[in-house]
Amino acid sequence: MDVIFEIVDKSGRKIHLSKERWKHITSPSSLHPYMTNYLQEIKEALTKPSKIVTHTLDNKKADYYLYIKERGVYLLVGVKYLNGDGFVTTAFLTRKLIR
């Protein structure tokens, strides 16, 4: 698997972003092609999040939020954990915390 980055999150868990997931997030046919300019912020959301919300129906999923003051929005980075490590599933901007 080709990896864009692997990072240790705020709670000490390894999380990676694969090339396949990055393509899914940023492709012109996706809902979030503007995310190509937010790679550094995605890393920051994982290491210094404003908030982490674990999904209520699936505790193997969490949303990491980073508030971007200049834009008045949150960057949401979705993560799924398998065998203790995580991988980024999605990333996009939102005006409010979703969960």
Enumerate the predicted regions with their spans.
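Ribonuclease/tRNase effector modules and their secretory precursors
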Residues: M1-R99
